[in-house]
A protein has these predicted regions:
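DNA major-groove recognition helix of helix-turn-helix/homeodomain DNA-binding modules
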Residues: 29, 49-64
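Gly/Pro-rich interdomain helix-loop hinge
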Residues: 43-44
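Residues within the helices of the helix-turn-helix
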Residues: 11, 22, 52
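Short alpha-helical DNA-recognition segment
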Residues: 18-38
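The alpha-helix within a helix-turn-helix
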Residues: 14, 25, 55
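A short, Lys/Arg-rich alpha-helix, primarily the initiator
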Residues: 1-16
Length: 67
């Protein structure tokens, strides 16, 4: 999966949950700037720990982030 595709999936899931970027960042315990870069496709390959925290904060399985 490319960074841009992952970023689109992440942003789509976040907006579907009516969650702001800062809210998700706080729930997942990641810096808002890092989350913004992930969504923009500027950062790639988040760690498994970050993926798990994002998935938990969004209420989805990790695999859904990677589809």
């Amino acid at each position: 999966m490319t960074g841009k595709r992952f970023g689109r999936v992440l942003k789509t899931l976040r907006t579907a949950k009516a969650m702001g970027l800062r809210e998700l960042a706080k729930k997942a315990k990641v810096p808002p700037g890092y989350l913004a870069e992930l969504e923009a496709g500027k950062k790639r390959n988040p760690s498994l720990d970050v993926l798990k925290r994002l998935a938990k904060a969004l209420g989805v399985p990790v695999t859904e982030l990677l589809e």
